[in-house]
Curated annotation (Swiss-Prot):
It comes from Staphylococcus haemolyticus (strain JCSC1435). This is 4,4'-diapophytoene synthase. One of its GO terms (biological process) is carotenoid biosynthetic process. It comes from the Bacteria. Binds 2 Mg(2+) ions per subunit. Mg(2+) 2 binds at N166, D170. Its cofactor is Mg(2+). Involved in the biosynthesis of the yellow-orange carotenoid staphyloxanthin, which plays a role in the virulence via its protective function against oxidative stress. Catalyzes the head-to-head condensation of two molecules of farnesyl diphosphate (FPP) into the colorless C(30) carotenoid 4,4'-diapophytoene (dehydrosqualene). (2E,6E)-farnesyl diphosphate 2 binds at R45, Q163. The gene is crtM. Pathway: Carotenoid biosynthesis; staphyloxanthin biosynthesis; staphyloxanthin from farnesyl diphosphate: step 1/5. The lineage of its organism: Bacteria, Bacillati, Bacillota, Bacilli, Bacillales. (2E,6E)-farnesyl diphosphate 1 binds at Y18, S19, K20, S21, Y41, R45, R169, Y247. Keywords: Carotenoid biosynthesis, Magnesium, Metal-binding, Transferase, Virulence. One of its GO terms (molecular function) is geranylgeranyl diphosphate synthase activity.
Length: 285
């Protein structure tokens, strides 16, 4: 049987495998906080992977039952991943977990198996909350103690901005996988067809306008979060700013690539390290 410390280290390794740069940043938090972050990240990861990788809805249901058992403290044996759930259960004894956000994530991941285009931006924004705003909310009790309503709102906004940024980065790739995340109403408003844009040698002005419309929504969220860093614990602020700056950098890279629908734009390791070094200097000073 694994020890509690081994369970936390298992969660830590999952975070390092999937998100090395952010894992490194979170590792600067005090021990109890960073261990809770590892556990939350690992739970969210297996929720995503249950459908995205394994197409196993029953495993997702097992995760859901395990989370309920942890919330109500009804068992110490789990149906899904015992190591992750044991670490998460321990973290939940130290921090005021927002279990509803985790249930919302699980519900969104399950519903996403039967994806349909969103009629309006309300559907798109609800989706962004469900897959990423929820994660922002889950992290707030660790990053802002005690968690305030404002901190929860900005955590939600940051998560939604990160997801919207992912969507703006992956328009072409998502289309080839049978998905269009821009809402029908907004596509009609801008008179844009993603199928037609894929076939063009040069993207239309209208496509660039709709892309920038959504980028502005993400940017507004980033601005809101960065203007209210004081709601977070002092040791958490650099991490929040790092996430916002790195992901905002993705929008810049898409523009530099002329909004290409063929290749995925990304922030280079060198640029990430530069952002990290600059922030470390800023917060050290």
């Amino acid at each position: 049987m694994s020890t509690l410390e081994e369970n936390y280290q298992y969660c830590h390794q999952i975070m390092k495998d999937y998100s090395k740069s952010f894992s490194y940043a979170f590792d600067m938090l005090p021990e109890q906080q960073r261990r809770a972050i590892w556990a939350i990240y690992a739970v969210c990861r297996i929720v995503d992977d249950s459908i995205d990788v394994h197409q196993d809805v029953e495993y997702l249901h097992k995760i859901n039952r395990d989370v309920k058992a942890i919330e109500h403290q009804t068992t110490t044996t789990f149906e899904s991943d015992d190591r992750i759930m044991t670490a998460f259960a321990d973290a939940a004894t130290h921090f005021q977990m927002n279990f509803q956000a985790l249930y919302d994530l699980i519900d969104t991941v399950e519903a996403d198996q039967h994806f349909e285009m969103f009629e309006t931006d309300r559907g798109l924004l609800d989706y962004c909350y469900g897959v990423a705003g929820t994660v922002g909310v889950l992290l707030i009790p660790i990053l802002a103690t005690p968690p305030s309503d404002e901190a929860y709102e900005y955590g939600k906004q940051l998560g939604e901005a990160l997801q919207l940024t992912n969507i703006l980065r992956d328009v072409g790739e998502d289309y080839r996988n049978g998905r269009i995340y821009f809402s029908k109403a907004r596509l009609n408003e801008f008179n844009v067809s993603i199928a037609d844009e894929i076939e063009r040698d040069q993207l239309s002005d209208n496509y660039i306008k709709i892309w920038e419309f959504y980028a502005t929504l993400a940017d507004n969220n980033y601005d809101m979060v960065l203007n209210h860093l004081d709601v977070y614990n002092e040791e958490s602020r650099m991490i929040i700013e790092l996430a916002a700056q790195v992901y905002r950098g993705i929008l810049t890279e898409v523009r530099k690539a002329d909004y290409s629908l063929k290749d995925r734009a990304y922030v280079s390791k060198w640029k990430k390290h530069k952002i990290y070094r600059n922030l470390k200097k800023k917060y050290k000073d």
